[in-house]
C-alpha cells in the first residue's frame, strides 16, 4: 500500500512540476512574441514563483484527476488479473490532464490555467501528465515483482 501511495505521489508531483514549468514557458513565449526581452534568469525566477503559486490551486486539481484515473486503471487491472503496464499509466495520465483543462473551462466558464488556451500549451500539459504517469507506473510495476 505504501508503494501505491508513493507511486501516485511521485507521479502527481512530476506531472505538476513539469506542467507548471511548461505552462510558464508557454506564457513567457507569448510575452517574448510581443517583443519583450525575457532573460533566462527571469524564466527561472518566474518558473519558481509559479511552482509556489500554483501549488495551492493547480496541484490539488491535478492530484484529484490523476489519482482518480490511475485508481480506476488499478481497479480494472486487478479485476482482470492482468499485469500493470508502465506506459498504460502514462496514457492514463496524459488523458486525465488533456481532459481536465477543457472540462474545467467548460464547467467554470473560464480557462483556469492560461497556457492551456493554445493547443501547444494543452499538449505540453498532456506530456507532463504522461511523464508523471510513467513515473507512477514504473514505481507501481516494481511493487508487483
What do these predicted ranges mean?
Residues 1-145:
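Juxtamembrane/disordered regions of integral membrane proteins
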